[in-house]
Design a protein with these regions (language model features):
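Short, acidic loop-to-helix structural element flanking the phosphoryl-transfer center
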Residues: 7, 101-155, 159-168, 190
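Substrate-recognition "cap/lid" segment bordering the active-site pocket of phosphatases
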Residues: 125, 129-134, 154-206, 212-224
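Glycine-rich phosphate-binding loop signature in dinucleotide/nucleotide-binding domains
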Residues: 148-151, 199-203, 265-266
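Alpha-helix termini
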Residues: 69, 145, 219-228, 266
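Structural recognition of alpha->loop->beta junctions
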Residues: 172-182, 239-263
């Protein structure tokens, strides 16, 4: 097996977004439903169980689930589609775009949310949670990958372009790295991955992600083409076996473990 390219997800892989995106999901859902049993464990459950790579979808899906007359077990609800959860909900006080706006006020701050998305001002947040994001990629990792013959790098993120642009300068990737954002297609659609891979023209690619949709995107890309593609998932220890059973080539706790994981897979 030849792997000479790595395509990174951003949130949860290159950037620690626990204090930004994840916290924004929690605050958004609690703003909508103050007594909601929302915590990080629940969010992790949903992200590894279904089509919840996009945090706008996740917020609205959780909101719909909480407003269903018949309460589904959270693990069961996580495997439903957004349309199914919305159809089962009743008495929703806010629609998708309104929930998106509340999330953006928390994450990017009210001023940016209003200017960028035209949302209605509701929470007056002057300090964006996005300020608390921490870059996890270290330059030494890229040196180690290059020593293994892996020098082609790309990015496929669920972020919109404006959110990518505001963090990109802090991530130590080479200039000119091909990037696909939400505007290029949503995971698990393989189109954004295909766009990046075509720019890299590799012999084989490893996708590094942190959600079920990253894995599904990679699998869909591999099934549709002739290029070998594997997915390595960054996750906690208690999630590892679930991702391996779903088809991940390997799981890692941190980016620092990536070279060893790839060596074990490539042989």
């Amino acid at each position: 097996m030849t792997i000479d390219a790595v395509v990174f997800d951003v949130d949860g892989v290159l950037v620690d977004t626990d204090a930004s995106y994840t916290e924004s999901v929690i605050r958004t859902v609690r703003w909508l439903a103050p007594d909601a049993p929302i915590d990080r464990a629940l969010i992790r459950l949903w992200r590894r169980s279904g089509d919840w790579n996009n945090d706008w979808d996740l917020c609205y899906g959780l909101y719909c689930w909480l407003n269903a007359p018949t309460k589904l077990d959270p693990a069961v609800a996580a495997r439903k589609t957004l349309a199914e959860l919305e159809a089962a909900a009743s008495g929703l006080g806010f629609g998708y775009r309104e929930v998106q706006g509340i999330f953006e006020e928390h994450d990017n701050g009210t001023a940016v949310a209003v200017a960028r998305y035209g949302v209605t001002r509701r929470i007056d947040n002057e300090r964006p949670l996005a300020l608390d994001e921490r870059v996890m990629l270290q330059p030494g990792l890229l040196v180690e990958l290059a020593a293994m013959g892996i020098s082609k790098l790309g990015v496929v993120t669920g972020r919109v372009r404006s959110d990518w642009d505001q963090i990109a300068g802090r991530i130590p990737l080479p200039a000119g790295v091909p990037v696909s954002t939400d505007e290029d297609g949503r995971k698990p659609d393989p189109a954004p991955l295909r766009r990046v891979v075509e720019a890299l023209a590799p012999a084989g690619v490893a996708v590094v992600g942190d959600t079920l949709n990253d894995l599904r995107m990679t699998q869909a890309f591999f099934r549709a083409g002739t290029l070998h593609a594997i997915c390595v998932i960054r996750c906690d220890v208690d999630e590892s076996e679930l991702y391996l059973q779903a088809g991940a080539a390997a799981t890692i706790r941190s980016l620092g473990e990536l070279p060893a994981a790839l060596r074990a897979v490539i042989g």
